[in-house]
Amino acid sequence: LQSGLRVIEDAFRNNRELASSLVRIIEKYAGKIDKEQLGYSAPIKIMHFCGTHEWTITHYGLRSLLPQNVELVAGPGCPVCVVPSNYIDLSIKLSLEGCVVYTYGDALRLPSTKPKSQARSLLDAKALGGEVKVVYSFLDAVRDAKTHSRDSVFLGIGFETVLPMYGFLFHKKEVPTNLKFLSLVRLTPPAMKYTIKLYRERGLLPIMGVIAPGHVSTVIGGEEWRFLPMNFNLPTVVAGFEPIDVLMAIASILKMINDKKPDLEIEYKRLVKTDGNPQVRRVIEEVFQPVYAAWRGIGMIARSGLKLRPEFGQAYDAFEYFGIKDVSPSEYVMTHAHFGDAGSYDIPPNCRCGEVVLGISKPTDCPLFMKSCTPESPWGPCMVSSEGTCNVWAKYGQMEKIKMETR
C-alpha cells in the first residue's frame, strides 16, 4: 500500500517536469482563446465544486502558475458550510435538553446567527453541559448509541461520498432505534445546475468550464455530469486531487474551449467509472428519496437533498420523532446571494459566505475575513470547515501570494 501511494505521489504530486509541461500547454491554449471567440475580454472562468480541489489549488499555489486570463473559482463544495443555521439551533436545543447529539468535528463550531452572548454552536452548547459527542463516522455513532438507551440524533451532513455508509447501515438494520437521523445530505449535480443557471440569469461573468469532483464521482459515476456539456455547452473534466490532476483538467478544458467542442472527460480514471458504483447506488435509492432542500446562503434547490424513505423514516427520521417541522420552499428566507440582504436566520450580519460559496465573491472580498472572522474564531460557516473556501484561504492563501510574488 505504501509503495502504491508513493507511486501516485511521484506521478501526480511531485512531478515537476510534467507540471511545467502542463503549464506550457495551458499557456498555449489560453493564448489562443481571444475575446472575439468568447465575446468579452474578461478572464476564462473555470469553476470546481469540491473543497478538496480548493485545498489543492490554494495549498500548492496553482493559481500562481496560470495565465492571467484563466481564473479558477470555487463553487458549492463544502457540505458543512451549506447547513442552514436553523438546524444548528435545533441541534443546540436538543443537546441542552439531554438528547445525545453526534456530529462530525468540522460541524462542532458551525455558527448559528445568534448573538455571541448566546450559544452559537454545538461547541458552545457542550461547554454549557449539552450532550454533544464528536464522531469520525456514522458507524462510530451507531456503535456508541448501542451502549445506552438515551434519545440520540446523528447530524447526517455530507455530499454523495458519505451516502454509502449511511445507506448500508440502514439497509443492514444496524442502526439502533434510539439513534435518530437528521438528514442534512446534499446532492452536488442539482447545486451545480443551480449555480450555472444563477450566473446566467444574473448576467455574471459566465462559467466557461467545470472541474467535477472526483470523490463524488466514485459513487454516482462520471456520466452524471453529462448534462453540463449537453445542456450548457460547458467543457467538463472529472479530476483527482493532486496538483497534476488539476492542471491536466485545466488543460483539457481550455483545449475543448479552443476547439469549440465541449465534452465530458474523466481524468480521474484510476478511481472513477462512468456508472460509479451500481451496487452502492441501488442501496442509496432503496433507503433515501430526493427532496427540496435548503442550502445555507443560497436558498432552496429542487431535489438536492435526501430524506429517509417511509419504511426507514418511521423509526429513524429525527424530524418525525422530535416533532420538528422542516423548512418548506415557501418559508425559507432567501439570502444575500439573491437579494442583497442577509436572511433572518441563515447568514450572520456582514458575512458574505453566501456569495463565497457560489463563487461570486472571494474570501478577501468579505470585510470580516481574517478580522472578526478567523479559523480560531469563525463568524461565518465558510471559515469553520477544512473544506470551506475561507478556511482554506486563511490557512494557505499567504503561501500562494508568496509563490506569485517570487514567480
Regions found by a protein language model. Give the residues of each.
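Cysteine-cluster motifs in flexible loop/terminal segments that predominantly coordinate metals
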Residues: 340-400
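Active-site cofactor/substrate anionic-group-binding motifs, chiefly glycine-
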Residues: 62-111
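Internal helical hairpin/lid segments
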Residues: 248-355
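A conserved active-site cap/scaffold subdomain adjacent to cofactor or substrate pockets
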Residues: 182, 201-275
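Active-site histidine-anchored catalytic micro-motif
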Residues: 148-156, 161-213
